[in-house]
Amino acid sequence: MAKKVENIVKLQIPAGKATPAPPVGPALGQAGINIMGFTKEFNARTADQAGMIIPVVISVYEDKSFDFITKTPPAAVLLKKAAGVEKGSGTPNSVKVASVTRAQVREIAETKMPDLNAANIESAMRMIEGTARSMGFTVTD
């Protein structure tokens, strides 16, 4: 018989840098997860993606065992990396802080495709372009 899921915990953690300190420790402690076991396994799985923020969905079972799924980094993080900026615009409608090319948007959309609710790459690109515009980026050809 399959294990019964007791709790689901969603976190965004820097790749390879999960520690028992807040915010990871308290979130996992409340769910009753072995914190050191999770941090070691997460850091081992994400060591090759250093510098990225990785969303993770942790399923906690009744016997306090767990497993987790790592997702692709958020579109905003990938866009900031592609544009080479620290943060987006505080007023995106009036102040543009950077620009990204359609080729960069396509590359990000292809990376994000497994996690996006998009039927094809063009609709995924439109989602990424919308995120870019809301961050104060211009999309150029």
Swiss-Prot record:
The keyword RNA-binding applies. One of its GO terms (cellular component) is cytosolic large ribosomal subunit. Pfam families: Ribosomal_L11, Ribosomal_L11_N. Transmembrane segments: none annotated. The keyword Nucleotidyltransferase does not apply. Keywords: Methylation, Ribonucleoprotein, Ribosomal protein, RNA-binding, rRNA-binding. SMART domains: RL11. One or more lysine residues are methylated. Part of the ribosomal stalk of the 50S ribosomal subunit. Interacts with L10 and the large rRNA to form the base of the stalk. L10 forms an elongated spine to which L12 dimers bind in a sequential fashion forming a multimeric L10(L12)X complex. Forms part of the ribosomal stalk which helps the ribosome interact with GTP-bound translation factors. HAMAP family: Ribosomal_uL11 (MF_00736). Belongs to the universal ribosomal protein uL11 family. This is Large ribosomal subunit protein uL11.
